[in-house]
């Protein structure tokens, strides 16, 4: 992952719904993994521009941390995602495609160990599209 950008989509609160279900909401994310253990995350999620305003899909940019734990899982924390609690994943990489499966869920109540999390493409370098 070092010096690569992982980008794709993940379901929000209804993330376990199949892709063809009308209620499914997917949000985009792009994460660049730096060699020093920092990450830069560009992502979208439902939010309001003003207190008590309408909810819409808004874009965010944050910096967090990542590491490889003793089990070989990728663990990361992003301050405003899951209250900044570290999440860990088992990674399945096939060419330029990658899928991450939860091995620890932190503060996510829609998560369970083994559930598919982020899935998408991996690109060399800092390669944000949004």
Enumerate the language-model features and the residues they cover.
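Lipid interaction determinants
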Residues: 1-65, 69-130
């Amino acid at each position: 992952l070092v010096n690569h950008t992982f980008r794709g989509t993940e379901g929000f609160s209804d993330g376990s719904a199949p892709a063809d279900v009308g209620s499914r909401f997917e949000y985009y994310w792009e994460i660049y993994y730096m060699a020093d253990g920092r990450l830069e995350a560009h992502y979208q999620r439902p939010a309001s521009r003003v207190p008590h305003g309408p909810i819409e899909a808004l874009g965010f940019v944050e910096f967090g941390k990542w590491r490889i734990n003793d089990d070989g899982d990728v663990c990361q924390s992003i301050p405003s995602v899951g209250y900044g609690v570290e999440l860990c994943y088992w990674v399945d990489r096939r060419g330029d495609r990658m899928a991450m499966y939860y091995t620890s869920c932190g503060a996510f109540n829609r998560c369970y160990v083994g559930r598919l999390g982020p899935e998408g493409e991996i690109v060399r370098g800092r390669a944000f599209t949004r």
